[in-house]
Amino acid sequence: MKKNKLAVLTSCLVLSGTFCTQAQNKTPQEIRIPDTYKLTNKSIYRNGWIDFNKNGKKDVYEDPMVPIDARVEDLLSQMNVEEKTCQMVTLYGYKRVLKDDLPTSDWKKQLWKDGIGAIDEHLNGFQQWGLPPSDNPYVWPASRHAWALNEVQRFFIEETRLGIPTDFTNEGIRGVESYIATNFPTQLGLGHTWNRNLVHKVGYITGREGRLLGYTNVYAPILDVGRDQRWGRYEEVYGESPYLVAELGIEMAKGMQTDHQVAATSKHYIAYSNNKGGREGMARVDPQMSPREVEMIHVYPWKRVIKEAGILGVMSSYN
């Protein structure tokens, strides 16, 4: 049975790559990886540490043996207002907001010349919502995609003042949002299985594929509790039961973060799924509920997933 499942998965991945290549009307052999950015700071890479701020000495934040809190405090003490501001920003990737697939000399004049908190969905093969797949050559194979993200990372490490790496984020609603990643059922579909082990495996594959593609942070699991079927994103929830959402959310997060593959960032904190009238998108409004309802229904999954799965990120609600 396991061999059959593996064969099916392998076939799906092969077909996914075939469709991706055909959509771009190119074969991997015809795509040349351009040398758009050259390594200019080889001297910053030392034995066991990186001289991120290029000052020739090992600062506290550059020492991997120092406790993380001390490293954070040291880095914050060296950051100016512009650098701190940029670390609060997420930049949407290629064909969404960012016009370049790889770094260019113009990047040193842009907002992110001082670094950027995260780049979301970069080079994942999609453009704006409703548009056909983008034609970038770094979607397939996965090794080329990872190489491209590493090139982007090199810009932030080597060409910004403090060398703060960016966080490569992506959606994980039904697997990694990539043109070549495995496309799982929605969370609502998985919720109907009531199968903890299955959801754990979905989480593991999601984290594994995200890591192999070069992403460091995946937005999942979704811990919204569905109480109004009119809501336009109802398919993203595990169901209407806080207990079910908590149980499956725990397994999804544990699977994703196995062996530190990626950071699991859950969303949306809190009560995002209960807008008045089930409104969503540009018409979204605030939720209306009692404090008891918030605590008993919507806070419950978050308490458990944070404590029992140790998720590494939280996305706030924006209703």
How does the language model describe each region?
Residues 1-25:
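Bacterial Sec-dependent N-terminal signal peptides
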Residues 19-319:
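Glycoside hydrolase catalytic-domain context in secreted enzymes
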